[in-house]
């Protein structure tokens, strides 16, 4: 995740979701703050793509779905939304919302020098709290 955008006020969840629909850039949301997502390298993209392809092939026909990079995960309702690099969900409740998933079975982050600290020390503890 990148740096917080310059904010004069905090964003409501509705403002964030509207911003995401209109913006060419992705941002993660945490308690009213938006964090611009950093671009990825070709190596990062290839690793995430390979993992996505592997998962997608393994779960074909099972009712599970694999997603890559551009789909939000709700970590805490109305408080915290992120974009995992790769996500797998098998929960029927996740079929209701095309843009946000809430019940992942597998989450993966491809670490890079620019995101490693944030992914390890901010996102990972929150991922581990998911049921």
Model-derived segments and their meaning:
Residues 1-131:
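Gly/Pro/Ser/Thr-rich low-complexity, intrinsically disordered segments predominantly at protein N-termini
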């Amino acid at each position: 995740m990148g740096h917080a955008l310059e904010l004069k006020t905090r964003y409501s969840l509705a403002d964030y979701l509207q911003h995401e629909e209109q913006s060419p850039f992705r941002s993660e949301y945490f308690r009213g703050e938006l964090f611009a997502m950093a671009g990825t390298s070709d190596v990062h993209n290839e690793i995430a793509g390979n993992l996505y392809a592997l998962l997608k092939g393994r779960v074909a026909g099972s009712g599970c779905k694999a997603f890559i990079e551009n789909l939000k995960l709700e970590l805490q309702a109305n408080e915290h939304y992120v974009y995992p690099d790769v996500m797998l969900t098998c929960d029927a409740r996740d079929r209701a919302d095309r843009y946000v998933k809430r019940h992942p079975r597998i989450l993966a982050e491809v670490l890079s020098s620019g995101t490693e600290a944030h992914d390890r020390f901010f996102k990972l503890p929150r991922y581990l709290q998911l049921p």
